[in-house]
Amino acid sequence: MLAIGLLASVHVVAQAPSPARPTEVPPLPADAHVGQTIELGGRTLNYTATVGTIPVYGADDKRSGDVVFTAYTMDGADRPVTFALNGGPGASSVYLNLGAIGPKHVKFGDQGDSPSDPPTLADNPGTWLDFTDLVFIDPIGTGYSRSVESAEQTKKDFYSTDNDIHYLSRVIYDWLAKNHRLRSRKYLVGESYGGYRVPRLTHYLQAQLGVAMNGVVAVSPYLNPTINENSDFSPMPWVTTLPSMAAANLERQHKLSAETMAPVIAYARGDYAADLLRGRSDPQALTRLVDRVTELTGLDKAFVRRAGGRLEIGAFLREAHREQGALGSVYDSNVTSFDPFPFASSQQSNDPLLESIIAPTTTAMVDFVTRVVGWDVSARYHALSYEVNGQWDTDSAALRQGAVPDLREAVAADPKLRVLIVHGWNDLSCPFMGSVLTVDQMPVMGDPARVSVREYPGGHMFYSRPESQAALRKDVLALYGQH
């Protein structure tokens, strides 16, 4: 989960500097395996869970780090393999693993879930394991993956946009070669900043390492980092976020559907954008904006007028639930918590959802890795690393360019490659409208459905809702069935 820069926008308690790295870093354990079963759709699936490492080497062929993976595999000659990454940067793959598509899951991320709930793993009805093997990758600095270099060299080699793509591509290549799976059908799935990674990984693997992906699933992706810039001039920041705010209001009224969202989307990309561009040249534009935005969001009209019909995300998340003394989450504005500082002029606490998911995912994953699989490690597990996020090179030209050029080139080069982009309606961290507008500006290369966008009830982690998770599984099955 997460998109770059979001962690910097919330209140974070200062952390002590990391201790100096020892001269010799003790080795991680050898790969460990355990046989497991789940019940899925009336069938029993037997599979092997593996926790292991892939070494990373620098330009001098010296080992620079160790990437830890969790793999779930079943017997079968023709099974595809799917590589999964989360985002941040600084997030491990635990959210896709134990929240979305792995064979076991722990409940988190929905309204009413508590960090102190017992993190019990149960069979996951939304898993993809029955139709693909799964390999979850934790980038350096997340999970148990670690650098063996100095802090300065680690930042240079691992916490920059291009180098991140280069070493992760090699990790995927090395896993395929080590496990004799280069001839398998291959897929990538990435969430949030992981959704930025997977188009770029696809193109780099295809063009530089000679490994072609069959399909890509981008979950709540961060495709186009500059789309929301320059809000004083461009209408795009407001056009991309208004539909998700309206979706949250429709959901609170139990009216959210693709049908009710259609006129919202049409307004956002039509009259709303036009009136924003008109500005003071049309004295009636502001009145039209305020009336329609008030109707769509259900907010107080005076509040909308003060904002000029341009609703800043943080202000919206407080205003939407102010009467209840609650805050909405940027990841799903209808997931709330009490506002601990209700009289402050701006939000003073961390995001409600972000705060609540670290404990259950960390506890469940550490117990699974060490006790269930038997990968006996004493290191700390980082489900979410603020340190990695804070050290990331956010000023690089490659990051500002976004993932869309790589997406276009990868799709153009392989006429059989298919890409599914999926979002939750309520997500304000990576709004669905950004992907809709981005894809609509891409040229049609063969079948228009080769690159498609789907939306589901929920937010950034919409898969925490059983109905949305089931709908995602159905759409992904259809994608895999094309190959």
Show which residues each predicted segment covers.
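Conserved acidic catalytic loop of the alpha/beta-hydrolase fold
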Residues: 166-184
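N-terminal cap/lid subdomain of alpha/beta-hydrolase-fold enzymes
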Residues: 16-21, 61-159, 440
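Catalytic histidine-centered segment of alpha/beta-hydrolase-like enzymes
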Residues: 459-468
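A catalytic-pocket lid/entrance helix-loop region that shapes and gates access to the active site
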Residues: 104-107, 206-298
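Short alpha-helix in the alpha/beta-hydrolase fold that links the catalytic acid
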Residues: 417, 431-441
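Glycine-rich nucleophile elbow surrounding the catalytic serine of serine-hydrolase chemistry
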Residues: 190-203
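Alpha/beta-hydrolase fold catalytic core
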Residues: 283-429
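Alpha/beta-hydrolase fold nucleophile elbow
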Residues: 181-193
